[in-house]
């Protein structure tokens, strides 16, 4: 069984979260936090997170703080996701790059700014499911976790 370690950002932009709205062929639309796989060349999980934010959003984030982790078990893959809260410093979507954008069969990665409130987050399908549960319980607390 393969194990994939991933990092994801709960990226705050004022009182909102920067999320990716994913549209993939043959699948319902869902939302997720930006981030991805920790590569062997990444010096640390935080370095991987900053690389992923640059690739997926052309974004720079301020200080990060780990807030939770979750595991997903598939038939051939065990995925460990570690989530960090951070504030958006800058974002330039024209700088987006990476393999996910090179192949149209990967679907769309639309940026969606969603108020960081349980009411705004409740109606959207957040993946993984533990992300949705965490945000419903802790969305209001996230801004206070950072300097």
Regions found by a protein language model. Give the residues of each.
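Short connector loops at helix/strand junctions that flank enzyme active sites
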Residues: 4, 12, 33, 61, ...
